[in-house]
Structures are given as structure tokens and as C-alpha cells.
Regions:
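C-terminal helical subdomain
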Residues: 193, 210-278
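The beta1-alpha1 cofactor-binding region of Rossmann-like NAD(H)/NADP(H)-dependent oxidoreductases
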Residues: 60-72, 115
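Catalytic loop of short-chain dehydrogenase/reductase
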Residues: 92-93, 104-117, 147-172, 177-178, ...
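Conserved glycine-rich Rossmann-like NAD(P)H-binding loop of the short-chain dehydrogenase/reductase
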Residues: 26-42
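A short, exposed helix-loop element centered on a Lys and neighboring polar residues
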Residues: 133-134, 178
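Conserved glycine-rich cofactor-binding loop
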Residues: 12-13
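Active-site-adjacent segment of SDR/Rossmann-fold oxidoreductases
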Residues: 26, 140, 158, 179-189, ...
Length: 278
């Protein structure tokens, strides 16, 4: 296994934290980026008590700011080496858009969401990912090997009513993945998506939804650890020719060889629009 330098955004909590530790356990050097200062000490303590063959550094940054994206890439390069893997996981969820959605008599309409929330969600879920990708891609292409992995969501979450602008932000990143993958074809950089494939059991999920899942009233939530096997496959040399795909973790079959599990859990990134009439 070749050791690589990885940046995981949204890497101090939830899915990102689990993916950061998964990469480190696989021997990679990881810069985990989040936005809450208290999480840094927790990551450092967890790293000290965990058997990882790689290394994890924790950093607080606001990736909506171009200057902070520059700082993240510079720190990775200075402390760990040239970034070869970027996991764009940072995101704001429904609990940010409408914290009281399960306590409202009527669901929130898109025009009731404040300008500040709309801007924060779009900037965090799409623009931050775009900014980070544009900063690491040139060096990866120059070196001839690397990975960008975006975390989006499933289509029926993107187009679900009363969740705007979450779906729009993830749809933008989904389509960007398709476009970017076409542009880097043949360069050694691949760009793919790794998704839970269903709601994820993280603090970003409303507690009411987590409780309903525990009671069996809604489908099972995906555990963060389920993201690690598809992620490790995508960053491996076995996936050198895998580009422009999305992998849903809830479809990954651990009983199969990774390449076969990947084949069954994957489909092309992006969308097929409704056909023209006639």
C-alpha cells in the first residue's frame, strides 16, 4: 500500500471524522479540517489512543473563505507533503436550514429560509468543495496521480420538498463531479463520489429522525463506518481507471472482493434529465 497525503473536509465530526480515521488506519497521512475549535483536542486525544499506521492532523478553517482554503493546502504541504487525496465532505444539513422542522405544524417553504442560511449552505456545500478542488487539482495532474472524492446525496433527497437549498447545493456538486471527471480523464487524477446512499446516523441528522429510525418507523440510517470500504477502494491503485462514478455505501457488500463490491455499488455521477416530449 502506498502512503498518500489526504485532506478531509468536515473531518472533525460525523462521516468526515470516520473517513479521516479510516484513511489513517490504512496508512495515509491525513489533514482533517473542521470548523469547531473544541473538536481539535478531541481528535488529538482520539488519535493518541487509536492504533493507526498513518497520521492525522486536525485544523480549524472556514472553507467558504478562499484564504482559508489556501491555508489548508499550505499546511498539508508543509506538515505532511503534497496533497494527493481530497475528500470534499464538509456540509451543512437540514438541521441548519430548519432546526425545528419536526416541531412545526407546517413544513417550511423555500421563501421562509433566510438569505444568510441560503448563502451559508451553498458556500459550504458547493463553493468550498469547488475552491478546494481547484487548489489541489493542478499539482495532482502535474504529478500524474491523485483522487478527489465528493460527498453528495441521493436524488430523492436532492429533490425533496421543504429542504431547500440543501438539495440544490448537493446537485451542484454532483454535476460538478461529472464535469470535472471528464476534464481530468487520462491525467491520473480521478474524481468520484462516495455517498452514504441513505440518511446517515450522525449528529447532522435530526435527533427526531434518528429516533424514528431506531424505532423502525423510517428506513435504517447508514453508520459512518460504512463509508470507509468504498472510500479505501476509490483511493487505491485498483481504482486507477475508475473516474466519474458514484458509490453508495449502503450498497457495498463486504462479503465480495472490493472490485466486485464496487461494480455493484456504483453508477455514473451526474443526472439524466427528463426526456424531451415526443
Amino acid at each position: 500500500m502506498e502512503r498518500r497525503v489526504a485532506i478531509v473536509t468536515g473531518g472533525l465530526r460525523g462521516l468526515g471524522r470516520t473517513m479521516a480515521f479510516g484513511l489513517a488506519r490504512d496508512g495515509h497521512s491525513v489533514l482533517a479540517v473542521g470548523h469547531i475549535d473544541a473538536d481539535v483536542a478531541e481528535i488529538e486525544a482520539a488519535t493518541a489512543g487509536t492504533n493507526v499506521s498513518g497520521h492525522i492532523l486536525a485544523l480549524v478553517a472556514d472553507l467558504r473563505r478562499p484564504s482559508d482554503c489556501d491555508r489548508v493546502v499550505a499546511m498539508a504541504r508543509e506538515r505532511l507533503g503534497t496533497p494527493q487525496i481530497l475528500v470534499n465532505n464538509a456540509g451543512l444539513t437540514f438541521t441548519t436550514i430548519d432546526p425545528a422542522r419536526f416541531r412545526r405544524p407546517e413544513p417550511q417553504k423555500f421563501w421562509q429560509v433566510s438569505d444568510d442560511i441560503v448563502r451559508a449552505v451553498i458556500e459550504t456545500n458547493y463553493i468550498a468543495a469547488d475552491q478546494m478542488a481547484r487548489r489541489v487539482a493542478p499539482e495532482i495532474v502535474a504529478h500524474g496521480w491523485g483522487r478527489i472524492i465528493n460527498v453528495t446525496t441521493k436524488l430523492d433527497t436532492m429533490n425533496r420538498p421543504h429542504t431547500s437549498p440543501y438539495g440544490a447545493s448537493k446537485a451542484a456538486l454532483e454535476m460538478a463531479t461529472e464535469v470535472w471527471a471528464k476534464e481530468v480523464a487520462g491525467t491520473g487524477l480521478t474524481i468520484n463520489i462516495v455517498n452514504p446512499g441513505a440518511g446517515a446516523n450522525t449528529p447532522g441528522m435530526a435527533e427526531e429522525m434518528r429516533q424514528m429510525s431506531r424505532e423502525g418507523r423510517v428506513p435504517r440510517l447508514v453508520e459512518p463506518d460504512e463509508m470507509v470500504p468504498p472510500l479505501l477502494y476509490v483511493v487505491s491503485r485498483a481504482a486507477d481507471n475508475v473516474n466519474g462514478c458514484r458509490f453508495d455505501a449502503n450498497l457495498w457488500d463486504l462479503s465480495l472482493p472490493p472490485a466486485e463490491a464496487a461494480r455493484r455499488a456504483s453508477r455514473p455521477a451526474g443526472f439524466e434529465m427528463h426526456p424531451q416530449p415526443g
